[in-house]
Every structure is written in structure tokens, then in C-alpha cells.
């Protein structure tokens, strides 16, 4: 990345910034169905959990965290273990700057190195920015849950998409790394 931007693995020291980026999405939008913003301590736990089994990356601009992306479990059944659910969040005003793409590219590289094959992403509709980003990154629509979540006095649909992280043409490794 250029212009004073850097993508790196997240750590507990990024929890305050990640919590601050996420809070407006929780309180002011239906983009996430969480109803209470996580505390920095809760965010630190999420970062640690993702780092253990998947990945969590942050985008720094001029030494300050302005976005993050992470992978987590898709479903708990063993057959799904090579698939993961991914999300990306950027500080307000940072959309359409290439940060989301850069975060996902770095995330997919780390997930591929751990043996993951497929990424799944859900997005509350309408959300043109997220739909456009995921489409541009090769995510394909696989279905929409209609009126699945109630937030801010309205029902919301969630579109689900998926894309390969690595080719799924062979048998998966015995274990994830």
C-alpha cells in the first residue's frame, strides 16, 4: 500500500481502534445485527480468537488504524472447516478508497496459508457499497434471507455471497494450519 498506509496482523493493542470503528455500524445502521457495541476488552477477545484459527488484519493510515477485516467460522460442523465467514469494516469516510479491497486481499492470503478454501460473506440489504466491493472481489450471490433480522424498527434482508480463496479442485488438507 502507498500513501502512508500499511496492512498488518491485528493484536490486542488494536482493540480500542477496532471497537471505535465498529461502534457506529452497531448503533446507527443495520449493517450489523449486533445491538450493543463491544467494549475494547471484548474486541480484544475477538481479535485473539480470530488470530488463533483464522486471521484478523488492520489497515493503518499515517500510524492510525482506520479499518479491519477478519475471518471466522462459517458453521460448526466438521465438513465446513475449510470454509470461513469474512467481514470488513472501514472508518466512516474511507469507503471507495481501496482500503476494503486491500484488507480482503491480505486476509485471503493469510486464510489460504492456513488451508481455508472458501470465503462466505453476508450483507444486510440495502448496502450498495458492500455489495459492490464483494462483487468486485469475485464473490458470487448464493441467496438472500428475506426479512431475517429486525433492527431500528424494520425488517432487513441479508444477501449471502461466496468466493474461492484457493482452488477447490483437490482434496483439502488433513488439518488447517
Write out the residue ranges for each language-model feature:
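Acetyl-CoA-dependent GNAT
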Residues: 35-93, 104-105, 164-165
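Glycine-rich phosphate/pyrophosphate-binding loop shared by adenosine-nucleotide-utilizing enzymes
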Residues: 5, 64-68, 156
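Conserved GNAT acetyl-CoA-binding A-motif
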Residues: 111-123
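Conserved beta-strand-loop-alpha-helix junction that forms the acyl-donor binding cleft
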Residues: 95, 121-131
Amino acid at each position: 500500500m502507498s500513501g502512508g498506509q500499511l496492512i498488518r496482523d491485528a493484536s490486542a493493542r488494536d482493540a480500542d481502534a477496532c471497537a471505535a470503528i465498529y461502534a457506529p455500524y452497531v448503533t446507527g445502521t443495520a449493517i450489523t445485527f449486533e445491538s450493543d457495541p463491544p467494549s475494547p476488552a471484548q474486541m480484544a477477545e475477538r481479535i485473539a480468537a480470530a488470530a488463533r484459527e483464522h486471521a484478523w488484519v488492520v489497515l493503518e493510515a499515517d500510524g492510525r488504524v482506520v479499518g479491519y477485516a477478519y475471518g471466522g467460522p462459517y458453521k460448526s460442523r466438521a465438513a465446513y472447516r475449510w470454509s470461513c465467514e469474512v467481514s470488513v469494516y472501514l472508518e466512516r469516510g474511507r469507503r471507495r478508497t481501496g482500503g476494503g479491497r486491500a484488507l480482503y486481499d491480505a486476509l485471503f492470503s493469510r486464510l489460504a496459508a492456513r488451508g481455508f478454501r472458501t470465503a462466505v460473506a453476508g450483507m444486510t440489504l440495502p448496502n450498495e457499497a458492500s455489495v459492490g466491493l464483494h462483487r468486485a472481489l469475485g464473490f458470487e450471490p448464493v441467496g438472500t434471507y428475506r426479512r431475517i433480522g429486525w433492527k431500528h424498527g424494520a425488517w432487513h434482508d441479508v444477501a449471502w455471497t461466496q468466493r474461492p480463496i484457493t482452488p477447490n479442485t483437490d482434496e483439502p488438507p488433513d488439518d488447517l494450519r
